[in-house]
Amino acid sequence: MQNFQPRHFAIVPAAGSGSRMATSRPKQYLPLLGKPLIFHSLAVLCAAPDVDKVFVVLSVEDAEWRRHDWSVLGPKLVPLFCGGGTRADSVLAGLRAVADEIEPSDWVLVHDAARPCLAPWHIEKLARELARDEVGGLLAVPVADTLKRADEHRQVLATVPRENLWQAQTPQMFRHVMLRRALEAATNATDEASAIEAAGLHPRLVESDATNLKVTYPLDLHLAEWILTNRGS
């Protein structure tokens, strides 16, 4: 009997507007080293030997995508114009759109469009450490700063012990059918791991590093540029 080897597919939800960047252009298209911000992580995903296809979930009204040349990334890259109003909506819409291409036990890696500093080793480590995991997991880094819990007036109520606290990153990697069912049941989930948690399961944390940052504010764009420019030097 032939053993079935699960494949890996990436989904990048990119239907958001990035309002905290205070720009008229969607955040994923802001220029970074001469390319759209999203280009950099797509290039790494498309070049990953273990990733079969990379699906980018875009807004139905996205007119910016076609203004750029993505052909250099090769045939793995597939745009899907079916994005929803939230991250969870977009990921679920993407999963439904490609349901015929992905087997139930295949792995799906969901990556933030606004994390341009993804490196090949991030993907390799995630896939390696989760290969035999029954649930899946996500890249994350231990919380380094002291955390405070406050009230609505920003008065400190308590200091939160940071032991065993982690900051979630992406990619987040789960089995296709498990992820789809979890998102269908938890439509308000802020990330895939929280949807899996809501289903009563326990994702595994795979330690990453601070270079895999999410561009949220204008200063983050400069930091991402520095990381990409100095990577490997």
Swiss-Prot record:
Site entry: Transition state stabilizer: R20, K27
What's the top EC group for this one? transferase
One Pfam entry name: IspD
What are the UniProt keywords, alphabetically? Answer: Isoprene biosynthesis, Nucleotidyltransferase, Transferase
Provide the reaction this enzyme catalyses. 2-C-methyl-D-erythritol 4-phosphate + CTP + H(+) = 4-CDP-2-C-methyl-D-erythritol + diphosphate
**Family annotation (HAMAP family):** IspD (MF_00108)
What is known about what this protein does? Catalyzes the formation of 4-diphosphocytidyl-2-C-methyl-D-erythritol from CTP and 2-C-methyl-D-erythritol 4-phosphate (MEP).
Which protein are we looking at? 2-C-methyl-D-erythritol 4-phosphate cytidylyltransferase
In its UniProt entry, the species of origin is given as Aromatoleum aromaticum (strain DSM 19018 / LMG 30748 / EbN1)
